[in-house]
């Protein structure tokens, strides 16, 4: 539906997901690409883990004495930027083409940076989001070693963010893409505007390679930056779609971050995490922080 079989064979699943999700987003937005200036139409689609499954497959050939049989497509299939690259190729998008790789924040950072590109006049329209296909032996083994995966034996207790009995996450796969455009561009084409991006904050804990800062200071500062840019107050926020990985440390430290950023208003805002329903999509998961609340508006 979104790509021919030959093109699909040259893509890791995360790239296939990105191309399909972008097609759905463009269709949902009612955009006619033939009427667009494609040099002003960009791509910012991130990926966190790359094509580890491809690396596994081709490395096995090397270890079995068949290095000369390694696929010529191994490198372009495994590198993270090919989610954005394949989307640009599939739809002829000739504006900015960037790949954000910031682990679980990838999707949100991609949308935020695309917002900035439009804000400063570098693009009129951007497709932005994240894509991931992490389910393979190496990735699963690594997360098991980190004790990050759920040990629950009952499915409805396997991914339970902020629950006192939480014990890790469940790996998911997929992609999510949104169309961002300047207000002027949207109005000129008579677009049905679903939501407006009015604030974006991005910070770093500079603390540890896997653990968030225990006091939540960095995450709190990111939320405060977004709130301030939007020109609102914490009391104006109705809902937070949290990272909520269902791990002990993340959910505890994220709760501290929300309380630090929102003060007493933290007790009045609705909070949940979509990982209880779709699992952890890593580089793709944080697009849900924008898209699912938008759908509910």
What annotation goes with each model-predicted range?
Residues 288-294:
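Conserved small/polar residues in nucleotide/adenosyl-binding loops
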């Amino acid at each position: 539906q979104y790509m021919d079989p030959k093109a699909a064979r040259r893509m890791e699943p995360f790239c296939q997901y990105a191309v399909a999700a972008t097609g759905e987003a463009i269709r949902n937005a009612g955009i006619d690409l033939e009427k667009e200036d494609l040099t002003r139409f960009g791509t910012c689609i991130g990926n966190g883990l790359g094509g580890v499954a491809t690396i596994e497959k081709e490395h096995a050939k090397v270890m079995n004495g068949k290095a000369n049989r390694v696929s010529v497509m191994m490198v372009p299939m495994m590198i993270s930027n090919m989610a954005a690259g394949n989307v640009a190729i599939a739809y002829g998008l000739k504006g900015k083409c960037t790949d954000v790789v910031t682990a679980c924040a990838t999707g949100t950072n991609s949308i935020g940076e695309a917002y900035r590109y439009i804000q400063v006049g570098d693009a009129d329209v951007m497709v932005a989001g994240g894509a991931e296909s992490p389910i393979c032996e190496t990735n699963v083994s690594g997360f098991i070693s980190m004790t990050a995966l759920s040990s629950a034996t009952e499915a409805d207790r396997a991914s339970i963010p902020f629950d006192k009995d939480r014990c890790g996450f469940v790996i998911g796969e997929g992609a999510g893409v949104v169309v961002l455009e300047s207000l002027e561009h949207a109005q000129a084409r008579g677009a049905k505007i679903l939501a407006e991006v009015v604030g974006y904050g991005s910070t770093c804990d500079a603390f540890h390679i896997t653990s968030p800062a225990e006091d939540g200071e960095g995450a709190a500062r990111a939320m405060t930056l977004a709130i301030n840019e939007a020109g609102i107050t914490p009391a104006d926020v109705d809902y937070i779609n949290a990272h909520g990985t269902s791990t002990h440390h993340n959910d505890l430290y994220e709760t501290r971050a929300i309380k630090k950023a929102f003060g007493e208003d933290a007790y009045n805002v609705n909070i949940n995490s979509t990982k209880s329903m779709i699992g952890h999509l890593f580089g793709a998961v944080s697009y849900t922080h924008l898209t699912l609340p938008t759908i509910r508006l």
